[in-house]
Amino acid sequence: MMDRKKTLAAIARHVTDADIVLPVYSSAFDWLDIRPNPLNYLSHGAMGLASSHALGLALGRPDRRVIVLDGDGSLLMNLGTLVSTAEAAPKNLFHFVC
């Protein structure tokens, strides 16, 4: 089984202060402990929409990397966004399920 904190720590080693990171739910609390940053975008209260928020941010801010740390349930609630993301194909969007 994957250890979420170890996974997030591995991702954090590749994140810069200029990156926008969208952690969701359980991952959010761990992420804020591992890598606090003013550009962490918490989307609590919008379960299933982290991928949509990330796509909008990636398209609106092509000058920044956008990293979404999604949950499996959250992603399953909005699978259609994967089609939109694939069609838009932003080079600055990185989507992890952890």
Where are the regions a protein language model picked out?
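Active-site diphosphate/adenylate-binding microenvironment
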Residues: 1-47
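Thiamine diphosphate
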Residues: 32-97
